[in-house]
Amino acid sequence: MVAADSAREAAAQLRRALRETPTVELRLDWLKSDSERRRFLVFLQRNRPRRALLIATCRRRKGGGLLAGSVQDELRWLAQAAAAGCLWCDLEVESLRKLPRGSIRKYSLPRRILLSVHDFGRMPRLDAAVGARWRGQVDAIKIAGAARTIADSVRLLRFAAKSRNCVAVPMGEVGLPARLLALREGSALAYAPVSAATAPGQVSLREMKYLYRAHALNGQTQVFGVIGDPIAHSLSPLLHNTAFIARRINAVYLPFLVKNLRDFLKAAPDFGLRGFSVTLPHKQSILRHLQDCDALSAEIGAVNTVVVRRDGSLYGCNTDYVGVLHALGKKLRLAESRVLVLGAGGSARAAAFALTRAGAAVGISARRSAAARELARSAGAEVVPHGALQTESFDAIVNATPVGMYPDTAISPLEPGELHCRVVMDLIYRPERTQLLKLAAQKRIATVSGVEMFLAQGIAQWELWMKRRAPQKSMRRAVLAALRAEERDRSSP
């Protein structure tokens, strides 16, 4: 999808898009003025790309677009797009309703018409959207509805699978997994912006093609994912999809924004999930939905990895445990060390159990005092009141809270005066250098980034699902490159 405010940028986006796909939507309404629209269409007419399928769209504001004009203005621009070489146009249903029935073919529009039904507040009534009224007037229908629940996404994918010439676009972050699977499920097209995503639930064209490989997914593709809330910050899709690509495995790993576990688990079979990672805030609550889990997960009381067995039953494991030991063990002899764990959630539980089993004396400090006491009792640790941190000393401090996580990167769970230790480890990996780690470094305290734990637990997950060795170097390289690029973007003026 080409969406730019100037003819120059639209032309540049079109060139980039055509290097990746022959089918491109041109959002003429995004161009900031009529003169920019004219300039771009002149460019298009003079530089008609060969073997390209161009779809012209000039959506009015009333239909969710940017064109400040009437239906006749919209049709005029679409007719000019046809003259410039566009074979298809996207026409909003509200515009078609304003025209006399059967009159649309009288206009000099592109040869093929894609009728768009948009609802930015909810999923529209699907059967009503594709009614008999439009038959013979249009060539295909696009349904773009806000997916408020995962069940909404499933409903739209099922509809696309049984309908001819239908384009399914589940909108919003909840709809992203279904959007990535749309082509596999029968949608005629899948949409992605040429540049970075412009709204929740979008991924860029390069991500869709090279990370998720949406065009190559088929009925044999194994589907995995990560569930959490929030989930947009997660680099797990990059980590796992990089491994699938490196090992040439027909599998994909998708991000699921999950607010209600029960709703997700009810819809999960429709995605054909073979396994999924579990992150905040579901690591503990997922336990009651599992049919079985390993002894370690039951003892910890938290799960970060689920295997979906052939009979559909769910089996839980915890690889956070491995990640903590792997990462902190590089800096510190854990046996007989005194380690403070901040937090009492799922990640904190894994850290506390891992460290006590490794022979460390563990202290728990958490905002929720009852949860801190329960974790200390079950893990064989002690409770350390927050007020004691000004005077208490430790060999290591481990932050297992989300404080400092992207996008709230300027805050730290501890003040400099509370850092009395030799090593500080932060389980947050995005950003790589959290505010807590920066404060520790200023005091010449050794630091351990959450990236090390993230990689270790993710590699263990991948090997658990795939039953083969993971391409660790490729996975590490991809994650570090993404984090360093992010850091450069943040520091550039």
Model features per residue range: what roles?
Residues L31-R46, V93-Y107, P124-L126, R148-A160:
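Active-site-adjacent beta->alpha loops and helix N-cap segments on the catalytic face
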Residues A358-A379:
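NAD(P)-binding Rossmann-fold cofactor-contacting core
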Residues A3, T23-L31, T57, L78, ...:
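Catalytic beta/alpha-barrel core
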